[in-house]
Regions:
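PLP-dependent amino-acid enzyme catalytic core
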Residues: 1-494
Length: 494
């Protein structure tokens, strides 16, 4: 039986996996979400010796069950290849009291590569499957990492255009240059005068604009998304949680069946939601620890059941988590409400019109899986320094948020369960923050800090940032948030 993906806002809006990948977002504003979970044979005595590609085949074939085995092999083998700098793809590193799952070994040194390396293959395969003649326009808002990873994946892919919006003053210099120097005739990068929430809200509006959709269709164009709102982004992230567990079994750190906690630095809620889905297919998960920075709207939600975006937006040293409207939480809300699309739509409407909602009647067992805490800027910097002093290992600021939150959780609960930290970016993506935290040196440029980071860590400067300082800047457009749609129409000649 083919797995059904339903809009979180309309029970009658159902599609297959390949259709969901092509559409990106549901036309009613909801997110396509599984209403049942596939059966996956998680026999870790066998899986522990499997390659990353083999684990990917096991998980993806269950969730994307309208793709053939041959189609999935094509997608997997083209995605997880020499673009990654280690055959392990996502190695697990043992530190003092925790395990860091390194998700930054792809071409843009951030965890988004794990899914965005395969999404273009999913999308072009799905387009062929459905005889799609329209050009696919990938429309994406980024808080720093998705934009570059999406462009790296889709650059010069036939039948696609990609347009990325980012907050002009809301990303690191390295992140910005990674985007603005991107090559590819089909890539377009636009800075906005506003924050990530402004960018994401306007992208959603464009997806839901009926008149714009009709204009696109008349020109043989169709929007899709590379954000984690697209199920094709989310499902590949389930793979690395299963793979991490298999590595723990293989190394003898745990016995198959032992529960493991995962601590995930969280902004748009996609990464931790993938861990939740891993639990639903049988991964022995104890707690999912949701780690936030000073934009702690999710921490408050899990503690009070009230989601309130009416608060100051703070620019932090972990910019990929500087988000007040966490889009993927909608999928968890849908599950918490027993997959009730009417109730979910009501709450999302309340968030849009009143800036908040309260969760009242919900599945307590699901919520019980989650713990939540946040780390301040000072705590994040202190954690980078502590981990370096303890393990001679440098974490990026997002990973350090998760690491600091895990230590808070452990102190509060005494929970001794083995815990994996999702290490979501290389410190080379945020060199100034890392070097300042470790050495106390201030006032360095990003490129001075890159050299210092190499000296301190002994880790080679990754190709993703090596030479970035002298790379030609190709994308120089900045627009007001209100002018985003006009910019899209101009690029597409509408």
């Amino acid at each position: 039986m083919t797995l059904v993906y339903q809009s979180t806002r309309d029970a009658n809006n159902t599609v297959t996996a390949s259709q969901a990948i092509l559409q990106g977002l549901a036309t009613d504003g909801g997110l396509f979400t599984p209403v049942t979970y596939p059966k996956v044979d998680l026999d870790f005595d066998k899986i522990k010796d499997a390659s990353y590609q083999e684990v990917a085949k096991l998980v993806l074939s269950a969730f994307l069950d309208d793709f053939t085995a041959e189609e999935l092999d094509y997608c997997i083998n083209n995605a997880y290849d020499s673009k990654f700098d280690t055959p392990a793809i996502a190695p697990l590193v043992k530190l003092d009291g925790q395990y860091n799952l390194e998700l930054f070994h792809g071409s843009t040194i951030a965890f988004k590569d794990m899914a965005l390396s395969i999404l273009p293959y999913f999308m072009t395969t799905a387009a062929k499957k459905h005889g799609l003649e329209s050009k696919i326009v990938i429309l994406t808002a980024t808080s720093g990492d998705t934009g570059k990873a999406a462009m790296a994946g889709f650059a010069d892919v036939p039948g696609t255009e990609i347009i990325v919006f980012y907050p002009k003053d809301g990303v690191s210099k390295v992140q910005e240059l990674q985007m603005t120097t991107q090559t590819g005739d089909n890539t377009h990068v636009i800075a906005i005068d506003g924050n990530f929430d402004d960018a994401q809200t306007n992208v959603k509006h464009m997806f839901n604009d009926v008149a714009l959709r009709e204009k696109l269709a008349a020109n043989k164009l169709q929007f899709s998304s590379a954000n984690s709102m697209n199920i094709g982004r989310l499902v590949p992230q389930i793979v690395y949680y299963v793979y991490a567990y298999a590595q723990l079994v293989k190394s003898g750190e745990i016995v198959a069946g032992d529960k493991v906690n995962f601590t995930v630095p969280t902004g748009n809620f996609g990464n931790i939601l993938a861990a939740f889905y891993a639990k639903q297919i049988g991964l022995p998960v104890g707690k999912l620890i949701c780690a936030s920075n000073d934009n702690n709207v999710l921490t408050d939600f899990f503690k009070t059941r009230v989601y309130d975006k009416k608060r100051e937006f703070k620019v932090t040293t972990s910019p990929s988590m500087d988000i007040l409207v966490s889009s993927n939480l909608e999928r968890l809300i849908f599950h918490l409400l027993g997959n009730d699309a009417v109730k979910t739509a009501e709450l999302m409407n309340a968030l849009s019109t009143q800036g908040q909602y309260e969760l009242i009647d919900f599945d307590a067992a699901i919520l019980e899986l989650f713990a939540a805490e946040y780390a301040t800027e000072e705590e994040t910097a202190a954690e980078i320094k502590r981990v370096y002093q303890t393990d001679a290992y440098i974490e990026d600021p997002h990973t350090a948020v998760a690491s600091a939150v895990y230590r808070k959780y452990q102190a509060a609960t005494g929970d001794a369960t083995k815990t994996v930290i999702a290490s979501t970016a290389s410190p080379y993506k945020f060199p100034v923050v890392a070097v300042e935290a470790v050495t106390g040196k201030v006032g360095l440029t990003d490129f001075e800090a890159l050299a210092q980071l190499h000296d301190i860590s002994g880790v080679a400067v990754p190709p993703a940032v090596d030479g970035l300082e002298t790379a030609p800047v190709r994308h120089k457009t900045t627009v007001a948030a209100a002018d985003m749609q006009a910019a899209v129409e101009a690029y597409l000649g509408l």
